[in-house]
Amino acid sequence: MTDTRKQRAAVILAAGKGTRMKSPLPKVMHAVGGRPMMDWSIALARQVGAERIVAVVHPSQDVLIAHLGKHHPDVAIAYQDPPQGTGHAVRCAEEALRGFEGDLAVLYGDSPLVPAATIEDLFGTLSDKTGLGVLGFEAEDPGLYGRLITGEDGSLEAIVEAREATPFQLRVRLCNSGVMAGRAADMFRLLAKVTNSNAKGEYYLTDLVGLARAEGIRCAVAVSGEDDLIGCDSKADLAEAEAIFQQKRRRALMEAGVTMVAPETVFLSHDTQIGADAVIEPNVVFGPGVKVAGGAQIRAFSHLEGAVVGEGCSVGPYARLRPGTVLAANVHIGNFVETKNTAMGEGAKANHLAYLGDGTIGAGANIGAGTIFCNYDGFLKHQTDVGEGAFVGSNSALVAPVRIGDGAYIGSGSVITKDVPDDALAVGRGQQITREGWARNYRAKKAAEKAARTTDQNKKG
């Protein structure tokens, strides 16, 4: 079957100052689910098949501009300076979309939770007769939201701001999200007719509805849930969006077979992957880039980021897995163990109080309590390799670069600076000296000294 769907493009509005965030960081660079809000909007545009994406930014947003250049080099950048409203912002993207003849969606860089299915529905309202679609939501408390006024046939007749609405219109709960889609050529042509004859002296995107209808272009409405369309203008909004995201992701994972003992205390990232029948205990934080296989157990108060956890592993409680950690099946990581850029083979164990950085640990190896991989010399990081079935005794320091051979034993309390062959024993510690009766004589001597000092002080007093 031939795909007759029109080409798609997206303009993402991100030039707002975000003064209510009270932060030097551009508003759209604040994160939800461990991901900048701008990245959520770019991902949304990609999910709905936008072949061309334009980010409208302010020239002063150096952090945002650098981020786009590094992580999204295919996203075109258009500058809005000074900001003069949403309609003006979209017009700033016109040059970047020169020659584009498909459908265009206008998205917002501070709305991180819009589902792709919702934008598909919005594009779906467009047809030969319907040239403009607006995304709305049924507000629990419409308040100051603009109202979407529809006709008997369901078409959109007007967007009315709350301050200009009649008492009858204020009873309407269908509100404007600001997200819009239409034929790109028509949208830019109509935008050229928008004026700034209003109290703020700005060019409003919402004016397109009246201009389109005046030309006989039908306008339509697609509806989404209110939570999906939350915009984040303040830290309070950001926290609300985070709570919505976490609740939805937790539920999705539990419905997929993940056990969460206290789900409200588990915090996930946008890309967290957890397999069926894994168990997540209370107060666990997943930073970006974590993949947990089925049957694994992540115990309480653990923090994972950039880590891969194999099937049947046990992690924690109070463990920290940092980026580059890869655990094969049935690995045990216990309390107060930190790993970074380290791979552990099947069945390897580090059950207590250890730092394992920049290393490999072979299958079945045992890392004793208090073991430290001394990986940093003040300038460079170095590698520690522990072979299969090796045993590292408690309170050992392995000074990298160093290799512990397969089946080798390291005596407790050792400082190891040289490679250890397979099946060898290495002990690097001071020799024990035992003096029988020394403690008894020492106590008697000190007791006498104390008594003499007390007698002398009494004479002086």
Swiss-Prot record:
Region (Pyrophosphorylase): 1-235
Highest taxon, organism lineage: Bacteria
Pathway assignment: Nucleotide-sugar biosynthesis; UDP-N-acetyl-alpha-D-glucosamine biosynthesis; N-acetyl-alpha-D-glucosamine 1-phosphate from alpha-D-glucosamine 6-phosphate (route II): step 2/2; Nucleotide-sugar biosynthesis; UDP-N-acetyl-alpha-D-glucosamine biosynthesis; UDP-N-acetyl-alpha-D-glucosamine from N-acetyl-alpha-D-glucosamine 1-phosphate: step 1/1; Bacterial outer membrane biogenesis; LPS lipid A biosynthesis
UniProt-annotated binding residues for UDP-N-acetyl-alpha-D-glucosamine: 13-16, 27, 80, 85-86, 108-110, 146, 161, 176, 322, 340, 355, 366
Gene Ontology molecular functions: glucosamine-1-phosphate N-acetyltransferase activity; magnesium ion binding; UDP-N-acetylglucosamine diphosphorylase activity
InterPro entries documented for this protein: Bifunctional_GlmU, GlmU-like, GlmU_C_LbH, Hexapep, Hexapep_transf_CS, MobA-like_NTP_Trfase, Nucleotide-diphossugar_trans, Trimer_LpxA-like_sf
GO terms under biological process: cell morphogenesis; cell wall organization; lipid A biosynthetic process; peptidoglycan biosynthetic process; regulation of cell shape; UDP-N-acetylglucosamine biosynthetic process
Cofactor descriptive note: Binds 1 Mg(2+) ion per subunit.
A GO cellular component annotation in the UniProt record: membrane
Residues annotated for acetyl-CoA binding in this entry: A369, N375, Y376, S394, S412, R429
Keyword Cytoplasm: yes
Catalyzed chemical reaction(s): alpha-D-glucosamine 1-phosphate + acetyl-CoA = N-acetyl-alpha-D-glucosamine 1-phosphate + CoA + H(+); N-acetyl-alpha-D-glucosamine 1-phosphate + UTP + H(+) = UDP-N-acetyl-alpha-D-glucosamine + diphosphate
Primary location: cytoplasm
Subcellular compartments: Cytoplasm
Obligatory cofactor(s): Mg(2+)
Region N-acetyltransferase: start-end pairs: 257-461
PROSITE patterns: HEXAPEP_TRANSFERASES
Gene3D superfamilies assigned: Hexapeptide repeat proteins (2.160.10.10), Spore Coat Polysaccharide Biosynthesis Protein SpsA, Chain A (3.90.550.10)
Enzyme class: transferase
Record has Repeat as a keyword: yes
UniProt: Mg(2+) binding residues: D110
Residues at the active site: H352 (proton acceptor)
Entry's family note: In the N-terminal section; belongs to the N-acetylglucosamine-1-phosphate uridyltransferase family. In the C-terminal section; belongs to the transferase hexapeptide repeat family.
Function: Catalyzes the last two sequential reactions in the de novo biosynthetic pathway for UDP-N-acetylglucosamine (UDP-GlcNAc). The C-terminal domain catalyzes the transfer of acetyl group from acetyl coenzyme A to glucosamine-1-phosphate (GlcN-1-P) to produce N-acetylglucosamine-1-phosphate (GlcNAc-1-P), which is converted into UDP-GlcNAc by the transfer of uridine 5-monophosphate (from uridine 5-triphosphate), a reaction catalyzed by the N-terminal domain.
Oligomer and partners: Homotrimer.
Name of the featured protein: Bifunctional protein GlmU
Record lineage: Bacteria, Pseudomonadati, Pseudomonadota, Alphaproteobacteria, Hyphomonadales
